Regions:
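N-terminal leader/targeting segments and the immediate start of mature chains
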Residues: 1-49, 55-57, 73-88, 105-117, ...
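A short, compositionally biased
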Residues: 20-21, 46, 64-66, 144
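Short amphipathic beta-strand/extended segments with alternating polar/hydrophobic composition
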Residues: 38-41, 60-66, 77-86, 137-140, ...
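Gly/Pro-enriched, hydrophobic low-complexity segments
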Residues: 53-59, 111-186
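Alpha-helical adaptor scaffolds
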Residues: 88, 95-96
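Metal/cofactor-centered catalytic core regions of large enzymes
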Residues: 102-106, 131
Length: 187
């Protein structure tokens, strides 16, 4: 882990970019508060557009930045500019990293305190603002800035942009929530 302010600032800048120049489709895994959900998402961070389909029931959500309209199966909702930063559903938060509560802002629960580059990925070590004994992590592709995962003791977000025959059997040692485990085939 590197705690030098210069390297941490560079890593934070790359992470906040969130792959802004890249449009992609992915599978999004969200776990927390005793629930696990999987979504098929399409995201264009630079265009500020996204759509998500919950795999368990097929319900959909999407956002149109031209009209500031959130479309859901229940109908449309026009949003104000002030509402947008905290309006991203869990399914697309990794596509828009600034929506995560990890940057040390007044409204955030965590702040980055160290970074590590391993292979093609960079991981930010996060420390809880109120309880410095609680940690989390945020991992992104170093080159593109596209987020891959966000782990805290109470929440998990993970994006899978392509299926791989072998991911090396990575074991993070814990999963957030209680009473449920990850769906079969998701590590």
């Amino acid at each position: 882990m590197d705690t030098s302010p210069e390297q941490l600032a560079i890593a934070i800048g790359k992470a906040m970019n969130g792959g802004a120049g890249t449009s992609y489709e992915a599978l999004s895994l969200c776990q927390g508060g005793g629930h696990v959900e999987r979504y098929a998402i399409s995201a264009n961070p630079r265009g500020f557009t996204w759509s998500a389909t919950r795999l368990s029931d097929g319900s959909t959500q999407s956002f149109d930045p031209r009209t500031l309209t959130l479309d859901t199966d229940a109908g449309q909702r026009v949003m104000s500019i002030e509402q947008i930063p905290r309006s991203f559903p869990e399914s697309v938060q990794l596509a828009f990293p600034l929506s995560l509560p990890i940057w040390g802002r007044d409204m955030d629960n965590y702040h980055p305190m160290a970074m590590e580059v391993k292979g093609a990925d960079t991981t930010l070590l996060l420390r809880h603002r109120a309880d410095p004994t609680i940690f989390g992590s945020f991992t992104f592709e170093t080159e593109s800035g596209i987020a891959k995962s966000y782990f805290t003791p109470s929440e998990v977000r993970k994006l899978e942009r392509e299926s791989k025959p072998d991911d090396g059997g990575i074991d993070f040692g814990f999963m957030a929530g209680h009473g449920q485990s990850l769906p079969p085939g998701v590590r």
